[in-house]
């Protein structure tokens, strides 16, 4: 259950004739799962089965604080601070802090708004509804191919607006390097039209130095969804290209995805998806695994059962051909899966639970 407090703004300002009220909400998601994955590379460079507990299989585990204040005449001020949690060990992610988001925004009804700080890219925002798993589920969707490693960026200014069925996003992230304005900077934009039966989305993302061995990465994507009755059919395409500094690193790719979400009952949802990636490597070394890579494919199946509006049980399975699960060996080890030498594919199955509050 969300906890809310009402705090008066202008406390101690005797000259204020009236004080606005700030609505503060503490919220979070707890998501934990147990997983079995085949053909993982062992420390001795062999092949083995991985059995582990993980966090954030359906949605990333997190806690956060958000606050909003109505300023009058349609104006509104917002702030959000959000931090990751690893449910299997209780730790944070990376350097800690509010890694998932830390931004302050100002908006006006009918105009849209602007947010400042660490936040998601425009492409991430727009394509969330065109993820077959409905929100970039790591079990098992190649999120790295869709949104990239830079799906959150620091020092960002983002414009957002929702005009009925049309949503717009655009952002710029400052690199902050003296004498080199574009170094480490990022930019992007996207739009979505969500009609009653059909939805379409398109987006572009550009970033300098977002991942190791890459000096410039750009991607553009388009997707569509059809909602006939209890089913949602989704298909998308993304092209990415990079300026790289190391042989064997992905320099260009074409990524395709398609799938369906089907509401079997009000509590039960079935998901099926297919993913394919056409990969080109920079200066591959002859006679090595990086020379002429086989284009990977993956099939994903998932079942979600809602225990309540905020509690969910899920089971997921995936099989990847010619790649690690979620194409991790081509997507900069986005989720930590590997593929043992001499193996042609990898399978995974997981059972988990998610609770929102």
Residue ranges and their predicted role:
Residues 33-37, 84-88, 121-125, 175-177, ...:
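Structural signature of outer-membrane beta-barrel domains
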Residues 58-62, 98-101, 152-154, 184-186, ...:
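Transmembrane beta-barrel architecture of outer-membrane proteins
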Residues 25-27, 76-78, 113-115, 167-169, ...:
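Residue-level detector of the transmembrane beta-barrel scaffold of outer-membrane proteins
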Residues 47-51, 143-144, 175-176, 243-247, ...:
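Extracellular loop and loop/strand-boundary signature of outer-membrane beta-barrel proteins
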């Amino acid at each position: 259950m969300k906890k809310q407090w009402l705090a008066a703004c202008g406390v101690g300002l005797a000259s204020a004739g009236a004080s606005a009220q700030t609505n503060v909400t503490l919220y979070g998601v707890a998501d934990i799962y147990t997983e079995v994955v085949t053909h993982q590379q062992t420390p001795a460079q062999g092949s083995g089965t991985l059995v582990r507990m993980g966090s954030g299989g359906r949605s990333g585990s997190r806690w956060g604080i958000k606050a909003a204040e109505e300023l009058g005449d349609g104006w509104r001020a917002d702030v959000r601070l959000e931090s990751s949690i690893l449910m299997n060990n209780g730790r944070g992610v990376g350097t800690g802090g509010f890694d998932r988001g830390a931004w302050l925004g100002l908006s006006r009804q009918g105009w849209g708004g602007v947010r400042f700080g660490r936040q998601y890219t425009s492409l991430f925002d727009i394509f969330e509804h065109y993820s077959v798993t409905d929100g970039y589920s790591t079990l098992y969707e190649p999120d790295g191919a869709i949104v990239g490693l830079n799906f959150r960026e620091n020092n960002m200014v983002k414009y957002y607006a929702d005009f009925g069925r049309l949503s717009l996003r655009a952002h710029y992230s400052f690199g902050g390097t003296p004498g080199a304005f574009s170094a480490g900077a990022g930019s992007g934009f996207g739009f979505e039209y969500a009609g009653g039966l059909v939805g379409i989305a398109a987006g572009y993302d550009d970033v300098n130095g977002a991942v190791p061995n890459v000096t410039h990465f750009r991607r553009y994507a388009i997707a569509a969804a059809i909602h006939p009755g209890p089913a949602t059919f989704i298909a998308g395409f993304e092209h990415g290209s990079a300026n790289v500094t190391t042989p064997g690193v992905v320099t260009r790719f074409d990524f395709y995805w398609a799938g369906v979400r089907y509401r079997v009952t009000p509590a039960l949802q079935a998901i099926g998806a297919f993913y394919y990636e056409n990969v080109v490597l920079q200066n591959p070394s002859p006679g090595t695994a990086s020379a002429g890579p086989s284009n990977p494919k993956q099939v994903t199946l998932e079942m979600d059962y809602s225990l309540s509006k905020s509690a969910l049980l899920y089971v997921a399975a995936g099989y990847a051909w010619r790649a690690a699960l979620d194409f991790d060996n081509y997507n900069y080890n986005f989720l930590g899966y590997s593929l043992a030498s001499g193996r042609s594919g990898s399978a995974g199955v997981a059972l988990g639970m998610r609770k929102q509050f």
